[in-house]
From Swiss-Prot:
GO cellular component: cytosolic large ribosomal subunit; cytosolic ribosome
Residue spans, zinc finger C4-type: 39-60
Domain of life of the organism encoding this protein: Eukaryota
Keyword Ribosomal protein: yes
Name of the molecule in the record: Large ribosomal subunit protein eL43
Length: 92
């Protein structure tokens, strides 16, 4: 592995290539895609990205579809709230 500095972090592997602004954008994406998320089924911090859009929990072995870079997207959250609201109006 290439040596990374404190300032550039995970994108230190690119060295001086591609420009600073592009490396900053890639840094944000790579940090979110490699981090662990809280599993919505077991509640542990063990949800990891398997491939693009597929997230699997190491503890309870559940696999779910999510965002490409993050586990839960803002669009998914708005759809979830809309479905919940429609269910509540249907029950009443």
């Amino acid at each position: 592995m290439a040596k990374r500095t404190k300032k550039v972090g995970i994108v230190g592997k690119y060295g001086t290539r591609y420009g600073a602004s592009l490396r900053k954008m890639v840094k944000k994406m790579e940090i979110t895609q490699h981090s662990k998320y809280t599993c919505s089924f077991c509640g542990k911090d063990s949800m990891k990205r398997a491939v693009v859009g597929i997230w699997s929990c190491k503890r309870c072995k559940r696999t779910v579809a999510g965002g490409a870079w993050v586990y839960s997207t803002t669009a998914a959250a708005s759809v979830r709230s809309a479905v919940r609201r429609l269910r509540e109006t249907k029950e009443q």
